[in-house]
Amino acid sequence: MLAYLRREWQSYGETVIAEGTFNSTSSDSSQSEKPIKTDGRYCYQAEIGRNAYSMDARGFMLGESDRHVDTTQFLPYTGYITDGIKYCNIEPPCGTLLRMHFDVSGDVSVDMHRVASIYVEVDSVTYDGSQYTIRGYRDRNLTATETQKKLIFYGFRKLGMIGMTGNGRVMLTSTIIQKISYKHQFTFQMHSESYVWGPCSGRIKTRVQGNDSRIIIYEQEDGFWKILKETLWIKLKPYFKPYGTMGGAFKNWLIDSGFEKHEYTYSYERDGQVVNATTVTYVKPTGKAGINQSWRPATDYNGQFTVLQPEDEFSVWYFEDKWQISQAIYAKNFQSDSQVEGELTNNGALIFKMNYIPSLAGITNKGGKVKYRYISGGFAQIDTSRHTGLAIILNFKCYGKKFYADNNNYPVDNALNPYICYIGDSYTLSGGTHYRQGACAGFAAGYDDEITEHDMTISYTVMKPSDPDFVTGGDNYGQTVTSDIERSIRDLQDQINSILAEMNIQQVTSAVFTAITNLGELPSLFSNITKVFNRAKDNIKKLRSRSNSDISPIGATKIIDKTTLETPQLSVINRMPEEYELGIIYNSMRTRKLIDERKHDFDTFAVATEMELPYISKVNTLTKEFKDYLKKPGLLSNDDVAVQIDPMNNRLSVLRRKYADIIEYKIDPELAHEVLSNMSNSATRSLFSLNVRKQIAMNNSFSEPTFSQIIDRMFDDGQLIDVLNNLNRETATELFDEFLTRIKSMLVKMS
C-alpha cells in the first residue's frame, strides 16, 4: 500500500502499477490468515496462534473485467448488440430516464430490413393488458423508421434481441440521465413480454428519483479492501474569473489579462442529502482582441484582452464529500455523459478603466461569446483549500467559427457579430461594413465572473478501505498546499509585467526604490516571519516536484535554500548582509496598495527568492590546476581578475583588468557544473552580478574613478551600498532590469 501512496495518480484515467504490492504473486496462501469482520472491526482467529501472517492480495489493474455483479441492481447495457442481448438486466426503477445512442457501422438488418443509426431518450415501457408501448424522444425532427423502432424496442424484451443479421455492427451507448432533453416524441407498440417501468408519483417518485441518481453497480469486499463501481449524477459548476493589469506611464495600457485558475465551492441536493462540491476551473485561452498600437501616446488606451476562442480548451476538476471516491486510493474505468455543451457569454461592465476621473475613464469595448462541449474525462490528483487527493477532471473544447481580423479588409458577417469581442474602439470601421483590425470571435477576459451549470452522469470503479476507521487523507487532511503559491506566481508575473512597462518609459514607482532608501530598517522586518516564510518555501518545493521542467545542473544558488552552504567570503569584502538582499527583493515586489495598507505578501516574496543568483570568484582564489583547465579552451587569460557563473543562462563571465571589460561565454551545463564545483571554496553568491557591480561602481558623482578603483569597488559591498543610495532614478532603473529578468526566468521554469 505504501507504494501506492508514494505515487501520484496521473490524469486522464491513466494509472501507475507498483511492483511488489498488489501485483505480487509471491505470497504463500498456505501461510495466510484471513481477517474476520466482527461488530464493524477486523480481527484474526486467536486460536491459530501464528506469529506471522501474509495476505494474498489480488491485483487490481486497468482493463480487467468486472466481477461479482449484483443482479439486484438495475444496470443499463452498453456495448455491441447481437442476438440475445438485453438492454437491462432487471426492470428499471420507476422514473428511470435512459439516453441510448445506436451507432450502426456496415450493413446491419433487423427482421430483414436495413437499419440506420439513431439517438433517442426513453422514459417508459408500459403494459395495458394487451400490448407493450415504448415512449421515446429523438434528437432531431425526423420520423423513426419501423426498423429503427424495432432496434430500440427488441432489447427491452425479456427474450432479448432477435432477428439481427448482416456483416456490420451496432454499438449501443446507454446512460442514466436526470431529465429528457430531446424534443421529438415517438411511440411504438409490441406484444412480446418486456421489462416495464414508468413515471413515479408523489413521495415515492421523489425517493426513487433520488436513488436513481446514485447506483452502486457492484460491491466486492476482500479483507481490508473494498472494490466498488458507482454511477451517479453530479451538478458541475465551472467558474470563469477574469483578471487584468493596467500599466504604462499613466496606467492607461492593458499589459496583461486572462482567466484565473479558480476554486469554487457550492452545495446542491442529491438523494435527500446536501452534497458539498468544489470545482477548480483552468482555462487555456489563445486568442487576443482589441487595439494594439505601440506608437499610441501614454495618455490614450492601448492593449488587447485575452480571448477564449473556438478550438481552445478548458478543464474542470471536481470533487465532493458524498461519493465513493472519498478515501479511495485507486480509481479506474471513468465514463461520463458525452452530450454536455453550453455557451459562455460576456456580461456586465468592462472591469478595466483608464486612469482618469470616472466620467472619462471608460474604454470603448464589446463583449463576445463562444460555444463549448464536453470531450473527455479522467482522474487527477488535486490539492486545494478543502481537499487533497483524488478528483475527476472533465475537459471541454470550444467550437464554432474561428475568426481574427489581422487587417481592416474583412467584411462584416451579421451571423458572426454576436461572437465578436473588442476593446479600445468600435469593433467595426466607420460605416460598419468591415471589421476593425484586432476583432476576434470568442469569450473575452474582461467582464463579470461567469458561472455555468451542467447536470452530468458519471461512472467509475474505486478501491478503498473496507473498514471506515481507516482513512487515506482527503477532506480531513486537506490543506492549501500549492493553490495560493500558484496564484502568487501569477501575481508576481503581473507585478513584473507592470514594472517592466513602467521602466520602458522611465517612470518606475517609488515602491521599487524603498529597498534602496530604507535598507537600514530591513533586518527587523524579517525577524518575525520565519514560520510563515518556511511554510511558503515548503509549498514551493511541492509545486516544483510536480513540474515537468528539467533539473538545473547547478544547485544551491538561490538566495534562500536549506541546501545552500555558505562559503568563506574570500572574493567579496564587507559583504552585504543577507537581510539586505532579502529587503531589496521584498520591497521591490511590494505593491503601492500593500504599502499604503501596511500589509505583507509573503507568498509572493517567497516565490521571488527562488530566483537563481550568480556565483562570483576572484581568479587569485582559484587553484592553479583549475586556472589551467579554463585557459585551455581560451576561457581565461592572465589579465582576468574574476570569473562568474550564472545558472540562469549557463554563462561564464570573466572580468578583465584592462578597461574593466566583462567577457561572456555560453557554456554547456556539464562545464558549468564543473566550474561551479571548483569555485565552491571561494565563490560568493550575490544578488548583484559582475555587470551590475560594474555599473554601480562607475557611478560616482564626486570623482572619475580609475579602472583599478572600479575593480576594487566591485568587490566591496559596503562601497556599493553607499553608491547605490545616491543613484538617480534612471540609473537605478537600468540596474533593476537585470533583477527583473532573473525573476522572470525563474517564473518560466516554475510555470
UniProtKB/Swiss-Prot annotation:
Q: Give GO terms for biological process.
A: permeabilization of host organelle membrane involved in viral entry into host cell; virion attachment to host cell
Query: What are the annotated GO cellular component locations?
Result: host cell endoplasmic reticulum-Golgi intermediate compartment; host cell plasma membrane; host cell rough endoplasmic reticulum; membrane; viral outer capsid
The answer to keyword Membrane applying to this record is yes
- Record keywords: Capsid protein, Hemagglutinin, Host cell membrane, Host endoplasmic reticulum, Host membrane, Host-virus interaction, Membrane, Outer capsid protein, Viral attachment to host cell, Viral penetration into host cytoplasm, Viral penetration via permeabilization of host membrane, Virion, Virus entry into host cell
Q: Where is this site: Probable cleavage?
A: 207-208, 214-215
Disulfide pairings: none
| Source taxon at top rank | Viruses
Entry annotated with the keyword Iron-sulfur: no
Similarity-based family = Belongs to the rotavirus VP4 family.
Q: By what name is this protein known?
A: Outer capsid protein VP4
What species is given as this protein's source?
Answer: Rotavirus B (isolate RVB/Rat/United States/IDIR/1984/G1P[X])
